[in-house]
């Protein structure tokens, strides 16, 4: 790799989920690792426990004496640490370039797509670990089985989530490339949907002549790309035209089962402890990757059946007084619809209402997908919307959460409410929730605190359980 010339790696924005994973991998490889972030978090505390020096706040002196500086897509070019590093002549690289360097010396499996990539990456990693292949894993969420989002493995494989948000995933050179779906997203970078599709074509084309692209046929924008993919590829989906397909899908509470087929050949029944039709697709992508890597079918089945999930992906926070509370990272209209649909399937019947607390993520996304957001919550009985989580972006005139709620009402939703202060959400939810309700916190910011706050409120007023002290 680059050992010898580089001994000390510094991460600007180390608390981010993608950055922290790379930092943990490099620390496991015995590099000296340091980093900075604007605030302390459970992630920074974990890294500190691993021997990573972390400074709170971005200051020029933080990068003096380091060999390379890695920055995330959230860091602005004028950041004082980047400015100082460039002045010192220290190499400054993006996160994707560092991930690409790790992948260069491995057999890379990269999972990209507008949605589902974190879960699919985690599923693939789980199956390959169960097969004894001991992959290195870098994923955009905390895997329950690992207790973290990254792990250095002894095997030749590297399984990574590929972030398409700024186009930097085109630096990766995977041997297997998965594309889960393509939606209008990150238009602040790409400008048009067609340019997004072009980027995914280039991503799939980066696999070598002996590699494989795994593509979701059910998604029309992915299907559009098939004639343009110059490499060997297979498709997956519920469609019978898919190379890897599913039939007989059944939803039983938080569990989903289906029968899988490979070009019409039955592969048997599969079960996963996650609700939602979208997770069937994530499993099919995993089955296709495992098949390419010659993982025995029974190993794949068992690994999927015991998969423990990923943090903030339909995570059940608790169930008190008949109220089930769920934390989900969904922040794009397609993800929102899929999560609400999964809740409807997991908790069917008239006795169950779906109550959603939503925090829009980024002003640009709210602006670019405003019309789609107005129709994304039709299946929610009650909707609470709080202010936009800026993620470092400046406000955009006329783009507000309050205006979004107004538009949602204008488009036919009968119970959409604006809660300006997110700290008021737990109290508002407590007043709304009744036995049988499913309360979902939706968003990529910090809205998940509201369901934990609701849980604390319900616990405080619920009668003590027998045998408790």
From Swiss-Prot:
Residues forming coiled coils: none
* Gene Ontology CC terms: cytoplasm
| Residues that hold ATP according to the record | 113-119
Q: What is its EC number?
A: 6.3.2.8
- Which reaction is catalysed here? UDP-N-acetyl-alpha-D-muramate + L-alanine + ATP = UDP-N-acetyl-alpha-D-muramoyl-L-alanine + ADP + phosphate + H(+)
> Which Gene Ontology BP annotations are present?
cell division; cell wall organization; peptidoglycan biosynthetic process; regulation of cell shape
- Keyword Ligase found: yes
Tagged with keyword Endoplasmic reticulum: no
HAMAP family per the record? MurC (MF_00046)
What does the sequence similarity comment in the record state about its family?
Belongs to the MurCDEF family.
Report what the protein is called: UDP-N-acetylmuramate--L-alanine ligase
Organism listed in the record: Sorangium cellulosum (strain So ce56)
């Amino acid at each position: 790799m680059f050992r010898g010339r580089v001994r000390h790696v510094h991460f600007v924005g180390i608390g981010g989920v993608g950055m922290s994973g790379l930092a943990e991998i490099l620390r496991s490889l015995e590099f000296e690792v340091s980093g900075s972030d604007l605030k302390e978090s459970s992630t920074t505390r974990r890294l500190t426990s691993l021997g990573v020096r972390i400074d709170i706040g971005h200051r020029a002196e933080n990068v003096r004496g380091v060999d390379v500086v890695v920055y995330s897509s959230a860091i602005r070019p004028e950041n004082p640490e980047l400015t100082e590093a460039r002045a010192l002549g220290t190499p400054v690289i993006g996160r994707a370039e560092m991930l690409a360097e790790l992948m260069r010396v491995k057999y890379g499996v990269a999972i990209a797509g507008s949605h589902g990539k974190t879960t699919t990456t985690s599923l693939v990693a789980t199956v390959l670990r169960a097969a004894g292949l001991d992959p290195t894993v870098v994923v955009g969420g905390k895997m329950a089985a690992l207790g973290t989002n990254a792990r250095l493995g002894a095997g030749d494989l590297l399984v990574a989530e590929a972030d398409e948000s700024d186009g930097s995933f085109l630096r990766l050179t995977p041997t297997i490339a998965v594309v889960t779906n393509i939606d209008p997203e990150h238009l602040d970078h790409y400008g048009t949907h067609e340019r997004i599709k072009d980027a995914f074509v280039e991503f799939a084309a980066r696999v070598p002549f002996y590699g494989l692209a795994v593509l979701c046929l059910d998604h029309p924008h992915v299907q559009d790309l098939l004639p343009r993919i110059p490499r060997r590829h297979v498709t997956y989906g519920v469609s019978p035209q898919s190379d890897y397909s599913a039939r007989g899908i059944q939803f039983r509470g938080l569990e989903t089962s289906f029968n899988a087929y490979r070009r019409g050949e039955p592969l048997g029944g599969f079960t996963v402890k996650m609700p939602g039709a979208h997770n069937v697709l994530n499993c099919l992508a995993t089955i296709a990757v495992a098949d390419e890597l010659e993982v025995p079918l029974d190993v794949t089945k068992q690994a999927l059946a015991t998969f423990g999930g990923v943090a903030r992906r339909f995570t059940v926070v608790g169930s008190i007084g008949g109220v089930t509370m769920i934390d989900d990272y969904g922040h794009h209209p397609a993800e929102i619809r899929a999560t609400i649909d999964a809740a409807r399937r997991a908790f069917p019947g008239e006795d169950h209402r779906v109550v959603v607390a939503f925090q829009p993520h980024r002003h640009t996304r709210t602006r670019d997908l405003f019309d789609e957001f107005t129709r994304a919550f039709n299946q929610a009985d009650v909707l609470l919307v709080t202010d936009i989580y800026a993620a470092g972006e400046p406000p955009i005139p006329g783009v507000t959460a309050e205006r979004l709620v107004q538009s949602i009402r204008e488009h036919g939703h009968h119970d959409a409410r604006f809660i300006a202060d997110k700290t008021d959400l737990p109290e508002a939810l407590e007043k709304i929730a009744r036995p049988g309700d499913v309360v979902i916190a939706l968003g990529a910011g910090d809205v998940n605190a509201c369901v934990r706050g609701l849980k604390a409120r319900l616990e405080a007023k619920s009668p003590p359980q027998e045998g408790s002290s």
